[in-house]
Amino acid sequence: MSFEGTIMSEYEVSLKDIRKTFGFVPGFMKPVPKDVLVKQWPLLKKYQMGESIIPQKYRELIGLAVAATLKCPYCTLMHTAMAKGYGATDEEISEAGYLTAQTANWSSMLHANRYDYPTFAKEVDMVGENAKKKAGKK
């Protein structure tokens, strides 16, 4: 079988799996080069929709935070819909947005004040140790 034939058959298998996963092949996947889709689909499926250490709802809330930071309307829409689909409430989505804003806010403050990074790293270690104590971990 030729390289082109192998890619086509792998591509057809990928499309079939995408249909099974989503119920259809989303239009945004159609312009993706066939050889790229064959390689990217298993990774997308595993880490975005499969079993993982991080529960699905929280992965989607993380994705939403990243999308909001990137100001990507496509990703924001997708991760909001997926988070809600996995049980996220409007309040959780709002809180994810707030946490995203807080990270950007404090990052701006630290950069604007040119806060000493080694000092910050030591302080963060102390904050982490304090959090462990409060959580009852050693």
Regions found by a protein language model. Give the residues of each.
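Acidic, glycine/proline-rich low-complexity segments that act as flexible tails and inter-domain linkers
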Residues: 1-58, 112-138
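Iron-sulfur (Fe-S) cluster-binding segments and ferredoxin-like electron-carrier domains
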Residues: 37-38, 78-92
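Amphipathic alpha-helical segments within well-ordered protein domains
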Residues: 45, 63, 80-84
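Short, thiol/selenol-centered motifs that function as redox-active sites or metal-ligating centers
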Residues: 62, 66-78
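Charged/polar positions within long, soluble alpha-helices
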Residues: 74-77, 81, 105-108
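Beta-strand segments within the central parallel beta-sheet cores of soluble alpha/beta enzyme folds
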Residues: 92-98
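Short Fe-S-cluster ligation motifs
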Residues: 98-116
